[in-house]
From Swiss-Prot:
N-acetylmethionine carried by residues: M1
GO biological process, one term: heme biosynthetic process
Subcellular location: Cytoplasm, Cytosol
HAMAP family the UniProt entry points to: URO_D (MF_00218)
Signal peptide location: none
Keyword field: Acetylation, Cytoplasm, Decarboxylase, Heme biosynthesis, Lyase, Porphyrin biosynthesis
Subunit structure: Homodimer.
Primary location class: cytoplasm
Origin: domain of life: Eukaryota
One Pfam family per UniProt: URO-D
The EC number(s) this enzyme carries: 4.1.1.37
Name of the protein: Uroporphyrinogen decarboxylase
Length: 367
C-alpha cells in the first residue's frame, strides 16, 4: 500500500526489481537496461498515437501518456519504464506559455527578459498543484504495468529549465541564460530557487502517485564551466535531492533511488557523485573505467552508449555493448544510452541493444 494524493494505492506486486536493486547498489543476476526517450518517435505506434493531438495536449492526457509509456515495453524486454511527459510542464505550471513547434522544438512566446518578469511567475506551491495530470498518468501507468517493471518519474533540473525560460527555446550557446548569470546573479538565484520550490513537491508527488525511481535531467550542464556549474547548478541539484528525500520521509513514503543525469557535466563527476543521488548518469563522452575510478563505489553508474551506435549493424552493436559492460563491470551499473533515442532510429536496433546487454551481462557473471 502506498499513499498518494488520491488516497491509498494498491499497486500490483513488482515482479522484476533488477533495475531498483542495481540503483540501490545491490547485486543483480544481470545488468538492467532502459533507454532515455524509449517512448519516442522512432516507434511507428508512438507516431500514430501522437498524431491525434498536439504535444502538450498529449502530456495532459493520462490515458495517452500511459499508452506511450507502455509501447516500448510491448516490444522490448526493458527493465524499467519511464513516464511519458516533458520537463517543460514545470515552466507551464508557473504560468509561462510553451508551445512545441514541429521541426523546431519548444518555443516560449514571452521568455523572461528582465528581473521584473519573475513577478509573472505563479507561486511555487500553486504551480506544483497544477501538475495533477502527471500524477494521474503515473498512477494509471503503474496500475497497467501490473508489476512488470518499475516506473521512473522525472523532471528537469533548475538550470536546464531556466535556460528554456530565458532563451525562449533551444539554443546552441545559451548566451541569454548565461548573460543572466553574469549580469543578474541575484535574479538568477531567485529564479533557480523558485524552480527548486516547484520541483521538490512535484517529484514527491510523482512518488506518491506511484513512481518507484526519479531522474533529474541537467541536460544543459555542458554550457557551464566548473565555476558557474558549482555556483548556479550544483547547489540546486543537491537541494532537490536533500529536500525530496526529507519530504518523502515526512509524508511516510518509502525512499526511492534518485538519478542525476548532467549531460556533458563530466568536469563535475566527483561533485555529482556526492550530491545525494544513488545513481549518476553518464553521456557517451565519458570513459566508463575513468568514471568508475573518479566516483568510487559509493554510487551506481548509468549509461552510456553513444545513441548513434544504434545506426551500426547488430553485430557491431553487440561488440560495443560487450566492451561497455566489460568497462563498467557487473555490479552497481545500469545500462542505458548516453542520451535519448533519435527519431530516425530502427526499433530492431534498439531491440538488439537491449538483448545484447542481457546476454553479455549474464555471460560476464558466469566468468
Amino acid at each position: 500500500m502506498e499513499a498518494n494524493g488520491f488516497g491509498l494505492q494498491n499497486f500490483p506486486e513488482l515482479k522484476n526489481d533488477t533495475f531498483l536493486r542495481a540503483a540501490w547498489g545491490e547485486e543483480t543476476d544481470y545488468t538492467p537496461v532502459w533507454c532515455m526517450r524509449q517512448a519516442g518517435r522512432y516507434l511507428p505506434e508512438f507516431r500514430e498515437t501522437r498524431a491525434a493531438q498536439d504535444f502538450f495536449s498529449t502530456c495532459r492526457s493520462p490515458e495517452a501518456c500511459c499508452e506511450l509509456t507502455l509501447q516500448p515495453l510491448r516490444r522490448f524486454p526493458l527493465d524499467a519504464a519511464i513516464i511519458f511527459s516533458d520537463i517543460l510542464v514545470v515552466p507551464q505550471a508557473l504560468g509561462m506559455e510553451v508551445t512545441m513547434v514541429p521541426g523546431k522544438g519548444p518555443s516560449f512566446p514571452e521568455p523572461l527578459r528582465e528581473e521584473r518578469d519573475l513577478e509573472r511567475l505563479r507561486d511555487p506551491a500553486a504551480a506544483a498543484s497544477e501538475l495533477g495530470y502527471v500524477f494521474q498518468a503515473i498512477t494509471l501507468t503503474r496500475q497497467r504495468l501490473a508489476g512488470r517493471v518499475p516506473l521512473i518519474g522525472f523532471a528537469g533540473a533548475p538550470w536546464t529549465l531556466m535556460t528554456y525560460m530565458v532563451e525562449g527555446g533551444s539554443s546552441s550557446t545559451m548566451a541569454q541564460a548565461k548573460r543572466w548569470l553574469y549580469q543578474r546573479p541575484q535574479a538568477s538565484h531567485k529564479l533557480l530557487g523558485i524552480l527548486t520550490d516547484v520541483l521538490v513537491p512535484y517529484l514527491i508527488g510523482q512518488v506518491a502517485a506511484g513512481a518507484q525511481a526519479l531522474q533529474l535531467f541537467e541536460s544543459h550542464a555542458g554550457h557551464l564551466g566548473t565555476e558557474l556549474f558549482s555556483k548556479f547548478a550544483l547547489p540546486y541539484i543537491r537541494d532537490v535531492a536533500k529536500r525530496v528525500k526529507a519530504g518523502l520521509q515526512k509524508a511516510g513514503l518509502a525512499p526511492v533511488p534518485m538519478i542525476i543525469f548532467a549531460k556533458d557535466g563530466h568536469f563535475a563527476l566527483e561533485e555529482l557523485a556526492q550530491a545525494g543521488y544513488e545513481v549518476v548518469g553518464l553521456d557517451w563522452t565519458v570513459a566508463p573505467k575513468k568514471a568508475r575510478e573518479r566516483v568510487g563505489k559509493a554510487v551506481t553508474l548509468q549509461g552510456n552508449l553513444d545513441p548513434c551506435a544504434l545506426y551500426a549493424s547488430e553485430e557491431e552493436i553487440g561488440r560495443l555493448v560487450q566492451q561497455m559492460l566489460d568497462d563498467f563491470g557487473p555490479q552497481r551499473y545500469i545500462a542505458n544510452l548516453g542520451h535519448g533515442l533519435y527519431p530516425d532510429m530502427d526499433p530492431e536496433r534498439v531491440g538488439a541493444f537491449v538483448d545484447a546487454v542481457h546476454k553479455h551481462s549474464r555471460l560476464l557473471r558466469q566468468n
